[in-house]
Amino acid sequence: NALIEKYYAALTGKDVQSLKELVDELDPSDESAITNSQYIEGYSNVQVYTKKGMTDTSYVVFAAYDHKYVGYDTLLPGISYLYVDTKEDGSLYIVADPNEEQLAYISEQLEDAKVQELLNSTQASYDEKLASDEALSKYLSELGVEGSAAMEAAEGAQITVKSNCNIRKEASQDAESIGKL
């Protein structure tokens, strides 16, 4: 829980130094993207779903959330993932650039029926909210933002978590809790 909160607080605050302590690597282009980010005002209503990672000490974290663009009132839903692993000292860290094996594993998790249900419901809500705000829709189109909230997960989009991260056996709020981040 502390790892995820610190990570997203650092992203929100554009605190590159803190991010370097929480992820396994952060290259100069990532640093620049973080410090120059100006479009998203914030994230809220974060719900985190966790699936077992490739090892006993790793996790695939799916996070559904609402995000607000600067200058617009509409909250758009989105979803993304993080791959979390454990250091030798037992502390958790976020894998900034998952390797091919990890990406393949994440792709397998994206095919899970419950994850698909989460992606589909998020996409339907995104489409509905965007259709109700013509100005925001036009703005996002001008920015080159495609209309797929659900696919942000497949592309590894980053988010801000402002709540606890429960690790669950399955990608469902009702699944057995097996820990917290």
Where are these regions (language model features)?
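A structural detector for beta-sheet-dominated domains
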Residues: 95, 160-162, 170
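SH3-family beta-barrel domains
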Residues: 146-166
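Second-shell loop/turn segments in exported
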Residues: 5-9, 70, 175
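SH3/SH3-like (including bacterial SH3b) beta-barrel domains
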Residues: 169-181
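Core segments of small alpha/beta cavity-forming domains
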Residues: 1-43, 105-153
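Exposed beta-sheet edge and beta->alpha loop/turn motif
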Residues: 56-140, 149, 180-181
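Hydrophobic pocket/interface hotspot
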Residues: 7, 18-20, 61, 84, ...
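Short solvent-exposed beta->alpha transition segments
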Residues: 16-65, 69-77
